Each structure stands twice: as C-alpha cells, then as structure tokens.
Amino acid sequence: MATFNVLCSNRFRFNGGYSPEKFNRKVSSRSSELNVCVSRIRTQSFSCRRLGGFMEIGETRLGVIRVHGDSRNRFSCNSEIKRLVTGDYGDKETRIGENGRNKGKRRRFSLRLRPRLRLVRMRLGRFDFRASMEDFRYFLKKNLKRVILSTGVALIFGLCYLFLRLTAVPSPSIVPYSDFVTNLRGGSVSKVLLEEGSRRIYYNTDENVEVVDDVHKSETLEDPAIQIDGGTVTEAVTKDDTPRKVRALPPVWKYVTRKVDHDEKFLLSLMREKGITYSSAPQSALMSMRTTLITIISLWIPLTPLMWLLYRQLSASNSPAKKRRSKNPTVGFDDVEGVDSAKDELVEIVSCLQGSINYKKLGARLPRGVLLVGPPGTGKTLLARAVAGEAGVPFFSVSASEFVELFVGRGAARIRDLFNAARKNSPSIIFIDELDAVGGKRGRSFNDERDQTLNQLLTEMDGFESDTKVIVIAATNRPEALDSALCRPGRFSRKVLVAEPDQEGRRKILAIHLRDVPLEEDAFLICDLVASLTPGFVGADLANIVNEAALLAARRGGEAVAREDIMEAIERAKFGINDKEARPRTLGNELSKMFPWMPSLARRNGPDQDGLQGPLGYQTLS
C-alpha cells in the first residue's frame, strides 16, 4: 500500500491512503493529461500516475506543482518541477523541496549575514566624508612628489604597452640562408625585400601568395574595384550589403633570413636570372621606434635600481657635511673636568667666535686648526662636544674614516662638500675625530685615494680662501703618524695635549659622574678614596668604575651604591674579572702604604682570617 500526496497550483491538496489504482481512478476522472514516472529500486519497478492538471468550474486548467508517492518498500517518487499547463495559477515554476532544504539554507545564510550587515551599517554610520577628504588631502600634500612620480611612471608604462600592442605585426619565420637560396633556384620565391641598414632579407613564396588570395576571396567583396591601400582606411561592402571599415595592414612577410657577407653579387644575379621581383627599403620609423622602446624596456629598466644606488653612493646626499642637530641635552664646559689646560684653550677660541674677546684690534687672527693630542679616553671627543654646546655657532662633526671610500676621488669630494657647507654657515667649527685615519704620512702606502683626500684637506685648511672664519678641531692619539704638512703652523696652529688627570682631576671627574648615583656614604669621601686608589686612570676608566659599581649594587638588590661595590669595581678595572691571584698582593700593598696605622694585611688570606673584615669596614677583597 502506498500513500500519495498531490499538491496543485490552486492550493488544492489530495492526500490519504490511496492505492495507485484508486489514485489513478480518482484523478483520471478530472485529469486532462496523464504522465507516467517510472523509478527503479533494487531491480523492482513501480509506476505511478502524475496528474497533469485539474478542471475547476470548467474555466481554468491548473498545473500540478508536486506529486509525491511513498510506499512500504521505502520507495519515493517525486515528480519533476515542470509547468504542464498554462493557466491563471500555473505560469510560475516551482522547485522541489522549496519548503524544505531551501528554507534551512536561507535561514543559515541570514544568520551569517545579519552580523556582517550590522557591522557594515555601523561603519557606514561612523564614516565621515569630510574627515576622509581631509586625510586624503594631507596625504597628497605630504607625499606629492611620490604620487606624481608614481603616476608618471605608471602612465609612461601604460603608453608604452599601448604603443607596443597597436604596432604589433606578425613575425616572420626565421629560415637559414641556404633554404632561401634553394627556394630561389627552385623558382618558388615570389617577392624579396632587402632591408637597408641591416642584414635581414624578407621573402614570400608562391604558396604564401595562394594562401593570401584564398583569404581575400573568402571575404567576397561585392565591388572588386574598391582596393585597400597601404596605411589607409577604406569602405568595403560584403554580401549582406553591410558597409564596414577595414584598416590596411603592412605587407606580411612569411620568411626572413640573414644574408652572408660578400654574397650580394651572386644573390642579385640569381634573382635576375629567375625573374623574381626584389626591392630594398629602409626600416620604417614605426618599427624603429618599436625596436628602440623594446630595447629600453628590456635593458635599461632592470638597470635603473642599480643606477639609482650608484647615484646615491656618488652623490653629495650621503656626504658627512651635515649640520649636527642633537636632540639630547648638549654638553658644556661645566661637564668637563680634569683637563683644565686643554679646556682653557678651547674656551678662548669659543670666546673669540662669540665676540667676547676683541682680538682684531691687536692684529690677531683666529687659529685655523686646533689639534687635540692625548691617550685614549682622556676626553678629547668630550671637549669637542663641549665646544659644540658652548660655541653657539654651526658645528659639523665627522669621522676621518668617512672620507675614505672605495671609489677614487670620493674622499676629496666629501672634503670639499664639508668645507663648502662650513663656509656658507661661517663662523663655524669642524670637528674631525681620529684624524690619523686620513692624515697619515704620504708615501708609505699605495692608497692613492687616501693621498688625494689628504691633499684636498691641506688645500682647504690653508688655501686661497684663508680668511674665512672656519675653525678645524681634530683629535688623535697617534700624533707621530700624521703628515708633517698637516701639522705645520697655519693649518693646525695649536697642538693641545690632553694628558692623564692627576689626583685632583680624578676627584673632580668622579664628582661629575657620581652626581646622579645614590650613595650610602658621603660622595666627597668616596671621591677622595677612589681618586687615591686609581693613579694613571683617565676619564673613561673612572666613568666605567662608577657604572660597574652601580651594576654590582643592582645585582645584590641594594637601594644605593656602597663602598664594597666601588672597591669591587676598582678591582675589576685594575685586574679584570676573576683574577684573584693578582688582586690581594697588589691592592693590599697599596692600602698598606695609604693607611700605615692599620694592621698589616699580609695575614688576611689565612684560613683563620676568612671571616674578618678588612680595612675601612668592608669585607676582604679576595
């Protein structure tokens, strides 16, 4: 027994437990058209009648929307969606399962789409057109050059691409020269063109002419008198009397070859013998432009980044002649201690530049150069930084190694750029650090670049324009390696020795470095103690001791730096880290000489003295 449900387009529903026979009899009385749907399941066939339409009041024929049959053998027959009869309610097509699967899909789609639509609506609500235009205007104003350059490059590439597309012609097949001679002897060559200025030979054969004729015949022009001239646009009429525009193409050559040198006489005699039409013509201007453009695109565009990098290396934009603009607080002469004699010399020069000392009424001239000489770490660069902070004039700071380049002549060019920039901002100061890198004695090496750079420096310091207010301050720790012409009066008129500080100088230097360091004891006592324990130390060594002491205090978790941290830092600076064999003897002897009233420290390394405290209240130094 099977159950059938019938749904018609006028919303009339047939349902109930009808057998196929009853259903067919029920429907056949009111049906105008019957179709049969046959389905197979498990080698069994089952037939069911499908209703084509109903008659209602004898006026309208209605189409069936759906017929569904279900049997006990799990057989189901769904009629296909089809408009059977045209009527008032049967004109629209309906899909099977529209109330089932499509409804679930539509619901899932709406659940996914709703939050996205809500998010888009919120963003559109917050969108401010005026603010967007202001941002766009600011972007254009800030990046106007880049936008113009990018637009121009894109436009040029677009025009080049359009030109290449419009001027594209079919390329002929390349054949050997021997094949060309063979075709000439065989008489199959119809026309030959010798291109002037090159070795290319274009030719067509008789087979090519026939193919071309067939192509023209297929077009079947009504008026044979209408010809297509080369490079002009004419009007043609086809069989259907429809006028159309035809643009003439250049002559298409099927084959091309390259002629052999000193074979022109043989080739011309052979063509004359065979009666072949030949001619010569220069390459057209359009093709020349196309060839040039292709060469530029394929050769120069890949080289453009390399040329740009090379230009940046050779240009003055990478020059060290840049005015020093430091965002950090500048260093003054109050921050320089321990080198009083050198500081006095530089203070005098700064005063002359600022106009505090009237040196002109006495007939004096500013020294052209000041050479700071001294061991490493004595504060030569710090003095130059103090000059930059106190002078109030343009200050140019460079390193001598920046003038030595791979390319010959670039060092001299950078020297010229540096002094030109200094002259434009005169009075000004130029500081050259580590002068021995470029100012070494000439003739000791084969480096011509270094010699040319030194020659340019000598010329700039004492050349024809010697009355300009440009002072050169240089620092070196190898004065014996400098060239004698560079150290003569008139170039470096003053040679200032920046020596190692004495005990009082070390105390002043320590006082400067300990200004921002919290101490457990009095800073004056610590400064005296460290200055007395560090003979021969320079400013860089003392700054390192203070920094090491602060690091040791941070390691042990202290809130301030103690004497033990400072003494440990002194031991690290003198003897290195973990060098316990050299520490006790040397430092103990020094402390015994300093404090003779204290007990002898010779026994402090004994096994019974490990827990005792050393002098000044700190633990033993081992």
Curated annotation (Swiss-Prot):
Keywords annotated in UniProt: ATP-binding, Chloroplast, Hydrolase, Membrane, Nucleotide-binding, Phosphoprotein, Plastid, Protease, Transit peptide, Transmembrane, Transmembrane helix
Post-translational modification Phosphothreonine, affected residues: T86
Subunit structure and binding partners: Oligomer.
PROSITE patterns associated with the record: AAA
Organelle transit peptide: 1-42
Residues reported in the UniProt entry to bind ATP: G374, P375, P376, G377, T378, G379, K380, T381
Name by which UniProt lists this protein: Probable inactive ATP-dependent zinc metalloprotease FTSHI 3, chloroplastic
Domain of life: Eukaryota
SMART domains (alphabetical): AAA (SM00382)
Organism the protein comes from: Arabidopsis thaliana (Mouse-ear cress)
PANTHER family for the chain: INACTIVE ATP-DEPENDENT ZINC METALLOPROTEASE FTSHI 3, CHLOROPLASTIC-RELATED (PTHR23076:SF110), METALLOPROTEASE M41 FTSH (PTHR23076)
Encoding gene (name): FTSHI3
Membrane topology annotation: Multi-pass membrane protein
Database matches in Gene3D superfamilies: 1.10.8.60, P-loop containing nucleotide triphosphate hydrolases
Compartments, as annotated in UniProt: Plastid, Chloroplast membrane
